[in-house]
Amino acid sequence: MQLQSSLDNLIFLVLLLVTIIYWASIILSNFKSLAKVGFYGTVLANSLIFCLLGSRWINYGYFPLSNLYESLFFLAWGITFTTIVLEYKTKTSIIGSISNPISLFITGFAGLSLPESMQAPSPLVPALKSNWLMMHVTVMMLSYASLIVGSLLGIFFL
């Protein structure tokens, strides 16, 4: 539980710093290195979320998508992953400056607002002890993440 709490806070801090760095890179467009720092910060946040989810998977023996806390962190992981891929392909920092605040809000809500009882893992009900859970929920959450990023970009370029 201590590792989870530490990773929660670290992920929130990294995403907060990355959001500030991305916004500063837009305001101070002469400093191109700020956008690179923001990109690598997003990669770090993505890796930390992966470590959080991986540690829960190893410690509790099931794929971590069975409660709201785990699902929100997986959604934040999907958003940061989509951001990394799109930003790498397009070489623009606008994507990170728009999508990282959403990841920040999601992780902030999951780690700081949800009560401990909702963050704690519980045994899976028999209906969720299926290999289909991992495949179905993973694909759905990744599609939600790409939909969120696409919607944000659509609104931005409107």
Feature annotation, model-predicted:
Residues 1-158:
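Polytopic transmembrane helical bundles with strong interfacial aromatic enrichment
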